[in-house]
């Protein structure tokens, strides 16, 4: 608690923002509550890694074999104690953050409802193979490798909008059904990533706006709605390029619709609960390692696993698969994909990032985190840990 208060007192004077209010809020949320959350995860994970190992090394588990103790007392008790500590620290952290004041309401963020990357990649593969100008080395490559490469690159696929043309992307109906406050967030680019002038018209159902700015910037475009606009519209975000140059964007990354959600305090509450779910999973993982390994080895293994979990998504993003990739690099990518898939329960929730960007932590995402990170995964890990504890205790008695 004292360290949390110290972080809220000292860190705001150290970190620097871009000078804007929005930038200052984002930097504060990432630097102060984010740092408290990160340190809490590492500290409780290391603590959990030593609980059972220390009891085993001091022969207390051998006594548990003489006077049988339930798995709840051996493992669920320490887990609940660690989670209670985390809940107190996170609640204190949230209280200090909200008391600072000056926060803005959060917003729902909607992405376009596009075809799955696998389907889009298959269609693109058919077009590539049907093109007579496709190199022979591409035609002779295994289809599964080509498909894997296209799926990985689908998220960064650009679409071009020439002057006088328009492009549309479907969105959920609720994105255009709100009474006010609809914003289109778009990042335009050019062929050589050069800064250029931009002008056009953005429409979403009954909402519309005229945009005149520059490319290479993330634009938040407030949309307005005529008072006499009736029914009969579709929820498609359309952009008509009225400028003189072709603009480009990535539909899966650069196009979003924002609508009002609720207050920052409610979003902070949901984000804190999501943080607690992740901490619960980490504590259960630490207790599981503690039953099988000595304390130093368990702590080392847990910290390495935590670092690899955070690095795997970045590796997949920065080093995409190519046809001429060496076998050793392909093996590394396969391992990174496996790690990213296996640890998605921990790396998936991004409560600090959502708070910093003003994104609403949805109740559905919180429910998924609570079910997977706080219930299912800890039950599985602690059940395995309880089995190992009883086996070790029985072996010591024998």
Where are the language model's segments positioned?
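Terminal transmembrane helical anchor/hairpin motif
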Residues: 10-27, 99-100, 104-261, 308-388, ...
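Central hydrophobic cores of alpha-helical transmembrane segments
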Residues: 2-5, 298-310
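Selective transmembrane-helix segments that form parts of the transport pathway or gating/packing helices
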Residues: 1, 39-40, 44, 70-98
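Long, hydrophobic alpha-helical segments
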Residues: 31-54, 58, 89, 93
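Helix-loop-helix units of permease transmembrane domains in multi-pass membrane transporters
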Residues: 51-81
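Cytosolic-side membrane-insertion boundary helix
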Residues: 256-277
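Hydrophobic residues within alpha-helical transmembrane segments
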Residues: 80, 84, 273, 304-305, ...
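Hydrophobic/aromatic residues in alpha-helical transmembrane segments
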Residues: 41-48, 61, 96, 285, ...
């Amino acid at each position: 608690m004292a360290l949390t208060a110290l972080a809220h007192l000292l860190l705001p004077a150290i970190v620097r923002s871009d000078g804007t209010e929005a930038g200052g809020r984002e930097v504060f949320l990432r630097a102060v509550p984010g740092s408290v959350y990160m340190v809490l995860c590492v500290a409780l994970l290391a603590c959990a890694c030593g609980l059972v190992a220390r009891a085993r090394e001091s022969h207390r588990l051998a006594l548990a074999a003489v006077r049988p103790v339930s798995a709840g007392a051996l493992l669920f008790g320490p887990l609940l104690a660690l989670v209670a500590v985390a809940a107190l620290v996170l609640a204190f952290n949230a209280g200090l953050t909200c008391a600072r004041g000056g926060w803005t309401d959060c917003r729902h963020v909607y992405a376009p409802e596009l075809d799955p990357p696998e389907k889009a990649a298959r269609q693109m593969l058919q077009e590539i193979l049907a093109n007579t100008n496709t190199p022979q080395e591409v035609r002779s490559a295994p289809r599964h490798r080509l498909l894997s490469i296209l799926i990985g690159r689908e998220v960064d696929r650009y679409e071009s909008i020439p002057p006088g043309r328009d492009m549309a992307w479907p969105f959920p109906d609720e994105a255009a059904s709100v009474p006010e406050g609809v914003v289109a967030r778009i990042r335009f680019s050019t062929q050589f990533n050069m800064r250029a002038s931009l002008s056009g018209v953005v429409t979403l159902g009954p909402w519309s706006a005229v945009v005149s700015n520059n490319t290479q910037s993330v634009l938040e475009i407030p949309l307005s709605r005529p008072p006499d606009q009736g029914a009969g519209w579709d929820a498609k975000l359309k952009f008509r390029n009225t400028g003189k140059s072709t603009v480009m964007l990535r539909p899966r990354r650069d196009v979003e619709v924002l609508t009002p959600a609720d207050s920052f305090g409610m979003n902070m509450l949901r984000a804190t609960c999501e943080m607690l779910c992740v901490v619960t999973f980490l504590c259960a993982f630490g207790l599981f390692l503690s039953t099988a390994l000595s304390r130093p080895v368990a702590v080392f293994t847990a910290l390495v696993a935590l670092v690899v979990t955070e690095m795997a998504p970045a590796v997949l993003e920065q080093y995409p698969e190519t046809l001429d990739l060496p076998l050793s690099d392909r093996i590394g990518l396969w391992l990174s994909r496996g790690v990213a898939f296996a640890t998605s329960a921990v790396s998936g929730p991004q409560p600090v990032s959502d708070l910093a960007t003003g994104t609403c932590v949805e109740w559905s995402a919180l429910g998924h985190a609570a079910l997977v990170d706080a219930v299912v995964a800890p039950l599985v890990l602690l059940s395995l840990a309880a089995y190992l504890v009883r086996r070790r205790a029985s072996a010591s008695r024998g």
